[in-house]
């Protein structure tokens, strides 16, 4: 079970309409276990897709993340390069998210369709890492001989076998958001992608921040995996697919409440320990 400092109590398990830089200043130093965020990429002319100044963002990120916390940010194209170079000291590696549906059909006769996005992982010290194992065919290749001239030093004889469990690699496949139901946001990420990342980089009861939470998918991911969350969304100039004006904060809250109702009683009790108004059942 995570431990909350007094300053964060009013923020935990809620979604706030605010400028994320200003709101993050209210979060206590070194109190967040994971930042999981789908930042604006700056790929469109929409006001909500404007890139947040990364130097200012990193100042707050580095202040609020725990020394062994993970900062996990989705990205694509040139924004990936900008993101990596914005903090080379903390950047560690990328994960490729292979999507079920491609994009870029307007340029299909000029360029390949785009079927992946990237996930950039940053941290100060080695964070929690729970590799999400998959199952393959068991094998036993016998005993490996001495290897005394390898690039990584000498190896003694060892039996090479597996019961079938396979460690994850840096390419992961998840269906896009429409496979999970209604899509509320133009860049909505799938809840299952978020659950995979939350399980990988946090433990039960930890706190996850999404400072540009959109329609709340990553917050739901945290909730379903027994983690606490803080969501921030500016909610500025929000028109769903250039149609009716919407409030993504209200959409997030509605989706989170619906997800909360699917939890078992033990999971609900874990959340309501912190008396979040968001989870009051009627």
Question: Which residues does each predicted region cover?
Answer:
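Core catalytic lobe of class I
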Residues: 2-232, 236-245, 249
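S-adenosyl-L-methionine
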Residues: 4-24, 254-282
């Amino acid at each position: 079970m995570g431990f909350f400092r007094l300053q964060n109590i009013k923020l935990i398990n809620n979604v706030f309409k605010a400028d994320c830089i200003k709101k993050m200043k209210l979060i206590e130093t070194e109190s967040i276990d994971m930042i999981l965020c789908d930042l604006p990429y700056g790929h469109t002319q929409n006001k909500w897709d404007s890139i947040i100044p990364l130097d200012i963002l990193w100042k707050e990120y580095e202040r609020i993340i725990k020394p062994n916390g993970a900062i996990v940010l989705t990205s694509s194209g040139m924004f990936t390069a900008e993101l990596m170079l914005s903090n080379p000291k903390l950047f560690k590696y990328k994960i490729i998210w292979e999507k079920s549906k491609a994009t870029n059909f307007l340029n299909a006769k000029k360029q390949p369709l785009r079927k992946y996005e990237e996930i950039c992982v940053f941290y100060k010290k080695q964070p929690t890492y729970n590799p999400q194992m998959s199952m393959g065919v068991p094998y036993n290749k016998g005993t490996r001989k001495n290897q005394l001239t390898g690039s990584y030093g000498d190896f003694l004889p060892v039996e090479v076998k597996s019961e079938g469990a396979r460690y994850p690699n840096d390419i992961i496949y998840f269906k896009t958001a429409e496979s999970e139901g209604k899509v509320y946001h133009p860049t909505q990420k799938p809840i299952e992608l978020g659950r995979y990342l939350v399980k990988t980089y946090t433990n039960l009861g930890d706190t996850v921040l999404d400072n540009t939470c959109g329609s709340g998918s990553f917050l739901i991911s945290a909730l379903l995996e027994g983690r606490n969350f803080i969501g921030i969304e500016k909610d500025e100039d929000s028109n769903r697919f250039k149609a009716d004006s919407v409030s993504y904060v209200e959409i997030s809250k509605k989706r989170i409440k619906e997800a909360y109702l699917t939890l078992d009683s033990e999971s609900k009790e874990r959340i309501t320990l912190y008396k979040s108004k968001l989870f009051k059942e009627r």
